Amino acid sequence: MEAKAIARHIRVTPMKARRVVNLVRGLQANEALAILKFAPQAASEPVFKVVQSAISNARVLADRDGVAFDEGDLIISEAFVDEGPTMKRFQPRAQGRAFQIKKRTSHITVVVATPEKEEAR
């Protein structure tokens, strides 16, 4: 079973968000939440929320399909950050000049899945 959550237009730079996402990729979902809760990076909060949302989505899918659900079985199978639209702002400078400031945004995607049981042959 696979469940997905996407947060779009998050006001954090993709490079900083990728640093946090790389910490939790491949881990169990509960372990990832524990790491994100105490991570010092500001990007850990939106990633935490997306992981929580993916777990909730998995719970809803399991209830809908009538499958037994155990949160401890979920692993983060995919996690990636794409670049969102960039907001362009201007900072006034001396002698009538202006410097451009790029406020970058991110699209954070997390997919949680239950590990496939190997069939006995």
UniProtKB/Swiss-Prot annotation:
Name of protein: Large ribosomal subunit protein uL22
One GO CC annotation: cytosolic large ribosomal subunit
Family: Belongs to the universal ribosomal protein uL22 family.
GO annotation terms (biological process): translation
NCBIfam families per the UniProt record, alphabetical: rplV_bact
GO MF annotations, alphabetized: rRNA binding; structural constituent of ribosome
Entry keyword set: Ribonucleoprotein, Ribosomal protein, RNA-binding, rRNA-binding
HAMAP family xref list: Ribosomal_uL22_B
Origin species: Pseudarthrobacter chlorophenolicus (strain ATCC 700700 / DSM 12829 / CIP 107037 / JCM 12360 / KCTC 9906 / NCIMB 13794 / A6) (Arthrobacter chlorophenolicus)
Function: This protein binds specifically to 23S rRNA; its binding is stimulated by other ribosomal proteins, e.g. L4, L17, and L20. It is important during the early stages of 50S assembly. It makes multiple contacts with different domains of the 23S rRNA in the assembled 50S subunit and ribosome. The globular domain of the protein is located near the polypeptide exit tunnel on the outside of the subunit, while an extended beta-hairpin is found that lines the wall of the exit tunnel in the center of the 70S ribosome.
Lineage: Bacteria, Bacillati, Actinomycetota, Actinomycetes, Micrococcales
Subunit structure: Part of the 50S ribosomal subunit.
Pfam families: Ribosomal_L22 (PF00237)
